[in-house]
Amino acid sequence: MKPIIVSVAGPSGAGKSYLANILKQNHSFQEIVSTTTRAPREGEINGVHYHFIDKDSFLKLEEEGGLVEKTYVNGNYYGVSKSEPLRLAKENLPIVLVAEPEGVKQVQKFCKDNDWINVSIFVNSPIEVLIDRLQSRMKQELENVKKDDPQYEQKIKKITDSNIGRMNHIKEFELKNWVEPAYSKDSIFDLVFDEFNKKNEVDVINKVKSEISRKQKLEDNIKKTSKVKKNRIKPF
């Protein structure tokens, strides 16, 4: 069976990581751990949520051709090292990856170059839902900072600035550059969901699995057709 990568993209707060976690925890998917140059947030663990490295190390990895995809968002680099999918592919289980839309294009190229199957998904939500989720996330992060922490003020400011930056990024960039193209006739995505939450969770998961099956069958048919044509060629 060909390796499968399911790429999940969408605006901040749409539920990309939530979908990836469900596929991983309940449906035997493996999740790629991305690499980033941004600092860890409260509660994030190196090697679990991200591989946290400095800018020079990231750029060196890129220069050596060691990245599947990379993006630059809010002053930080994000990417996936080639070693991650190649390692996970040995387990013969589908792989899920959360990426920005530009990163999805790069993953699609990686899959095409390596003869892998790719399913690209875009998860959206109404703008008011996105903002509400980010505000709730910010509130939770702020509550996790202990008041007796010597760096309390700095951490509060960092969390606040980061989340406000993400909210502004949604309004000023993501809606026009990510959401609108996802719904266009030239969309790069196989599946686009207007919203993802507990109410439609089962339906979304079923559609993702159906799309994987459809692409697997398509690959099988191509393989069979190629084999038949090969057998029809008579030697001179």
Question: Where are these predicted regions, by residue range?
Answer:
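Walker A/P-loop
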Residues: 17
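ATP-binding Walker
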Residues: 14
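Conserved phosphate-donor/acceptor-positioning beta-strand/loop module used by diverse small-molecule
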Residues: 94-101, 114-138
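Short beta-strand-centered segment that lines the nucleotide-binding/catalytic pocket of NTP-utilizing
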Residues: 29-41
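Small-molecule kinase domains that catalyze NTP-dependent phosphoryl transfer to phosphate-bearing small molecules
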Residues: 140-232
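Hydrophobic anchor at the beta1->P-loop junction of P-loop NTPases
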Residues: 8
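ATP-dependent small-molecule kinase phosphotransfer cores
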Residues: 38-103
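P-loop (Walker A) phosphate-binding loop of NTP-binding proteins
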Residues: 11
